[in-house]
């Protein structure tokens, strides 16, 4: 095993163009934020190493383009992903409505037991908010996936979103697994300490 880390998890950020996927990645990986919006061309990725339960986990986070014309490129990145974060913009109802389509993409291209996380970004824009926290939470609960509202601008829940995803993947893989794709399904069901029931910024 590589001495630098115990696990290597590949994460994927998907969602409509302009919802803030790149901003979330920049905030988590580099702790920076930019107001200027430049559309991701194809795929970009960053790496950050975290500590979780005494283990060193290397996160390889892929940021995908939300535009339709890149869909064929990005579909290949679903394969091999351990976790997929579906992002929508809380000020854009259509981006939330399209979450169902993104989830269908996951079902079509990703491995069957991939971990999913729903994220409502831009929760700092309270006066422009159109997607209610409760609506999104109930939707996520009905699918059995965790949900958080985040703000890449204010760094609200960004760290927690990625840590939640890492913890969920680690829990699914079981104690003896490395990132070699061990498809263990005998997961112990236990409370996840990093999962928040509240949005924290609604």
UniProtKB/Swiss-Prot annotation:
Is Lipoprotein tagged as a keyword? yes
Q: Which GO terms describe its cellular component?
A: plasma membrane
Specify the superkingdom. Eukaryota
Q: Which Pfam families match?
A: Ras
Q: Which GO terms describe its molecular function?
A: GTP binding; GTPase activity
Q: Where is this motif: Effector region?
A: 37-45
Sorted alphabetically, the Gene Ontology BP terms of this entry are: protein transport
List the SUPFAM superfamilies hit by this protein, alphabetically. Answer: P-loop containing nucleoside triphosphate hydrolases
Protein name as it appears in the record: Ras-related protein ORAB-1
What is the species listed in this Swiss-Prot or TrEMBL entry?
Answer: Diplobatis ommata (Ocellated electric ray)
